[in-house]
Structures are given as C-alpha cells and as structure tokens.
Amino acid sequence: VHDDSLWNKPSVRQALGEALAFLTGDRWALSFVRRQHDVVEVGPRKLDLSIPDKIIMPYSDGLDSRAVAALVAAKENGGLVRVRLGTKGADTKGTPRKQRRFTAVPFDVKLGKRQRVESSARSRGFKFAMITGIAAQLAKVDRIVVTESGQGALGPIIASSGQIYPDYRVHPAFTQRIEKLFAAMGKSVPTYEYPRIWYTKGETLAAAHALEAAPTWHDTRSCWQDSRRVSFGGRRRQCGICAACMLRRMSMHTAGIVEASDEYIWENLGARDIHGGTVKG
C-alpha cells in the first residue's frame, strides 16, 4: 500500500477486519507492507457538467440498477454518478459523451497457480462498497445509493440456504461497517442509502416503468446460466426457470411489463411438460 502507517493503524485494521468478518463469516488476520514503487499518478481531468455531482451509485446494468438509477435521476434532477467495476457498458446513448455521469473502474486481480477464484461471490459486495466509497471521496459526495429492493437486501439473511453463513453483501448492517472503516481512516464518511428497501422488485420496476423517460428492459440479463447452456439460433437467451429468471419474470409481471417469449429458452411457464414449455428445435 502507499501509506502503510495508515492501514496498519489499530483502528483501521479493526474496522476493516470487522467488515470482512461480518461479510464472510471468517476470521481475518490483516497486515500491510509499503509498496516498493510508487504508482504513476494520473493528472486530474475535469468533466463538462453543468450540475455538480450529488450521488454515487454502484451500477451493474441489471434490472435493479436501471430502475433505481432512473428513479433517483428523476427525483434529484441530475447529479447521479453510476460506478461500475469493469469496462463494459455506457451511459444513456442520447447524452453527449462529455456529460455522461458513468465511471467504469478497471479491476483486475492476478492469482497464483495454486490459488482459486473466490467462489462465494461475497468479495463482489466488498468491492462495490469500497469502490463507491472511494468514488464518493473523489467526487466530494456524501450520498451512495444502494439499488437493491427488499428481496435483494434483506431476503438473503431471512431465507439463507442450507448451513451457509448468511449473505450480508448489500445489507445495511454491512454498509454501516464500511462507513465506520472510512471514519477510522479519517476520511469523509459517506452514507449508504436504501431508497427501495421497503419495496419489492416488482414495485420498483413498476415505478420506473411509469416514468416519462422509462428505461429499456429487454437488453438486461438476470439469468445465472452461461451462453453454452442458453444459446439458441445464434443468440444468447435466458433460461427462464432458474431462481433469478423466476424472480425476474414474476417482477416483470407485477410491474405490467410484457417481455417477448423468445427472450427465454423456457418460453411458456404454463406448459404441462418440457416439450410444450421450451423453444422448439
């Protein structure tokens, strides 16, 4: 790290350890060493924005992200900065490039030959929380909006699977610990807001769909299956029957949004058998 004295402060290590332990259920022993070489600094660049930044939002381009981004942008009348881990995606195409409040954060971790990719997906929640917190520091913004509805934020701990440790990735109790970490580091403390936590996914989609400038939905993905399992006719579909697809379809139905049946491999949920439900061919 650049500032090993900061990261090795007992208060910082304790706050970081508590956040990680709460997220993963593991015990953490943390140590930090100073970098041997400084990172080349990039000069600051100014964005041509008429409205100052107000809110940071972690963005995945899924249903929740699109819906909540549209709702927040409409309510706040601008100033929303969407932050994505990775380089895929862009902001609204109709907006001039210099005015797009969309920041992609390249994130790459190289593993040794004997190391395995973390499989619980919980590191993703930590990365999103930290990157958006850092973005808030850089933009001098103290509000971070979390896009999850009640199912996403509270559901995983209410209905945990088997004997696994509860999933707190987007739970307010976890983001409160991230706030304490920034406070221990002596930084300005962002507040993580949950504007849709007391709504269902379907209610959130319905509210966004009712906006004058409603988002598009057909080009979002919810399915857990990869292209090898759900491709047909040279196009990648969604399976239609995994847990993520079922929540998507129920939420779309609740919101009154009609999807084309050919978005899914299992086109007809009302069919009696697999032959009547899946795409022909």
Predicted region positions:
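A short N-terminal interaction module
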Residues: 1-18, 23, 31-33
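Nucleotide-activated chemistry modules centered on ATP-dependent adenylation/adenylyltransferase
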Residues: 19, 23-56, 63-281
